[in-house]
């Protein structure tokens, strides 16, 4: 088992531009330290139904209402997350979708890097990498995030919503885990979905592709990424 950079095709070039947007890095940094309620706020706003901050402040009284902190770091983060999420919501539908996907990948990378040793200069955490196995045709699509630690490798695919869970994704993750086992290697297959866990489980129940050995990280459990 070995890891390789993805080929710089047209898709990769376009997506690299999206990932390099300051808004992506700013939103990801905020969401990496966010509370569950703040992450739910971000998801709701970024769906683009309304770009009026007052609408969302009224819908999330625990963050902005009379009982919410009037000031301090938590209130400032809520305001910053709302502002960044509105910026995403104001984009056109296609660009908004791309930006949201890039944010989920960036949040995932930031949290994974908090694991012991993962933040070192020679970090094993990488983006957009393929996993190669002897005698097996390489997958077309690279993995969003990989942890390339010998004996504790991980392939992570990231999705904005539960509807992104499909047979192709599940097959690719499970195939990688299986091929690694064939080579006596350990590889954890993980899918990160920025959506409610219940929605993800309902979606998985409808899938016939193998997923029993694939780890699910949903909106409520994002912080588990930092603990392995």
Residue ranges, per PLM feature:
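Intrinsically disordered, low-complexity Ser/Thr/Pro/Gly-rich regulatory segments
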Residues: 1-228
């Amino acid at each position: 088992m070995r890891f390789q950079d993805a080929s710089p095709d047209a898709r990769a070039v376009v997506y690299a531009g999206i990932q390099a947007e300051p808004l992506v890095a700013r939103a990801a940094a905020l969401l990496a330290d966010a509370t569950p309620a703040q992450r739910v706020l971000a998801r709701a706003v970024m769906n683009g139904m309304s770009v009026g901050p007052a609408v969302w402040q009224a819908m999330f009284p625990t963050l902005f209402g009379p009982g919410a902190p009037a000031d301090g770091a938590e209130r400032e983060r809520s305001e910053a997350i709302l502002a960044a999420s509105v910026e995403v919501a104001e984009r056109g539908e296609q660009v908004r979708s791309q930006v949201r996907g890039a944010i989920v990948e960036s949040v995932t990378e930031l949290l994974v890097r908090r694991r012991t040793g993962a933040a070192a200069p020679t970090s094993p955490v990488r983006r957009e990498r393929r996993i190669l196995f002897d005698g097996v045709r390489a997958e077309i699509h690279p993995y969003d995030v990989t942890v390339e630690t010998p004996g504790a490798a991980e392939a992570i695919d990231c999705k904005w919503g539960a509807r992104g869970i499909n047979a192709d994704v599940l097959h690719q993750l499970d195939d990688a885990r299986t091929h690694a086992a064939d080579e006596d290697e350990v590889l954890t297959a993980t899918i990160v979905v920025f959506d409610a866990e219940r929605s993800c489980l309902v979606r998985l129940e409808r899938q016939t592709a193998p997923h029993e050995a694939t780890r699910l990280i949903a909106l409520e459990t994002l912080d588990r990424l930092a603990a392995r």
